[in-house]
């Protein structure tokens, strides 16, 4: 076993319950283009294919887990309603521009009826909910349950209007209150709110805890999405398609996996949405690029690959890459 890498051969559905709570999930599964064994013939049934996985992600993720969802444009369009239904909040559609090298020598522009495709999308979502309730709705609903006027929330927080304008608003000005302010809302609501509705802003874990503020801080940490944006990055990633030594090939020299992602891209995703020690899931591992990136950057990886050929190749690659990393560190 490789330290901090928990990689399984089989269907991720059989392993999710054994995995630690993820800070980030990197999904690179079926595309509906018949691109590999197990892929669907077209995009029409992708929503059904992904839904069982989305259900488990939603059940087991943290309150503000980040999801990176790779697919084609039409594939993502088919799966987006399922993600939204299960509480995932859309953040940004990123485009991987693979460059002309991706189609050079493989397209005949005289016979094409559309532009050659050199891109795929990677869509960023955050969980943004408590259970299946978006946190924005949860906070406002809890306050409304108290029967107190909204302006009393400002009094509770000791602010002029930040509570009503930001913490309890229904519009785009919303942001999650700092833990100290959330604790003030909770205490005020439970002291002055309708006694029949108590407790407010709490769950069984919080209510049973004798250190309510510490528990609130712990829960707040799970509610805040992590994102560290490099100064030179946008939502268009111009990275050439894989070739050379990084591209894994079979014994005949042919590309082994048609959907292998560049490690440079995986590093960017992992570093931008996690910190050292965080957990990363890769449910459709392929050659485990996201998992390797996670481990070499000090994260903990959980992944699965259903095709034993890809799994074995991915494990060999993982082991080789880790040995290389150790040698580099020694010298």
Regions found by a protein language model. Give the residues of each.
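Core catalytic lobe of class I
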Residues: 1-304, 309-311
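Conserved SAM-binding loop
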Residues: 314-315
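Positively charged, low-complexity nucleic-acid-binding target-recognition regions
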Residues: 1-2, 157, 319-331
């Amino acid at each position: 076993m490789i330290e901090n890498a928990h990689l399984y051969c089989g269907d991720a559905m059989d392993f999710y319950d054994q995995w630690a709570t993820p800070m980030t999930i990197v999904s690179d599964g079926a595309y509906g283009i018949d691109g590999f064994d197990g892929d669907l013939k077209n995009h029409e049934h992708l929503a059904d294919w992904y839904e069982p996985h989305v259900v488990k992600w939603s059940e087991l993720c943290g309150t503000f887990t980040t999801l990176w969802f790779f697919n084609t444009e039409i594939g993502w369009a088919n799966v987006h309603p399922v993600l939204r239904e299960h509480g995932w909040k859309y953040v940004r559609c990123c485009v991987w521009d693979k460059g002309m090298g991706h189609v050079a020598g493989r397209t005949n522009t005289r016979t094409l009826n559309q532009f050659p495709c050199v891109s795929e999308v990677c869509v960023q979502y955050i969980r943004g909910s408590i259970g299946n309730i978006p946190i924005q709705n949860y906070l406002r609903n809890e306050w409304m349950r108290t029967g107190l006027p909204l302006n009393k929330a400002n009094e509770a927080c000791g602010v002029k209007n930040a509570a009503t304008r930001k913490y309890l608003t229904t519009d785009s000005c919303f942001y999650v209150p700092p833990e100290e302010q959330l604790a003030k809302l909770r205490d005020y609501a439970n002291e002055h709110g309708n006694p029949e509705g108590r407790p407010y802003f709490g769950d069984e874990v919080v209510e049973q805890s004798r250190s309510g503020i510490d528990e609130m801080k712990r829960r707040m940490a799970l509610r805040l999405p992590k994102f560290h944006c490099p100064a030179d990055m946008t939502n268009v990633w111009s990275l050439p398609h894989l070739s050379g030594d990084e591209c894994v090939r079979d014994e005949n020299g042919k590309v082994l996996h048609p959907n292998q992602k560049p490690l440079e891209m995986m590093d960017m995703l992992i570093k931008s949405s996690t910190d050292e020690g965080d957990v990363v899931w890769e449910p459709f591992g392929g050659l485990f690029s996201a998992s390797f990136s996670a481990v070499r950057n000090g994260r903990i990886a959980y992944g699965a690959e259903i095709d034993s050929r890809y799994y074995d190749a991915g494990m060999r690659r993982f082991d080789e890459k880790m040995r290389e990393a150790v040698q580099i560190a020694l010298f």
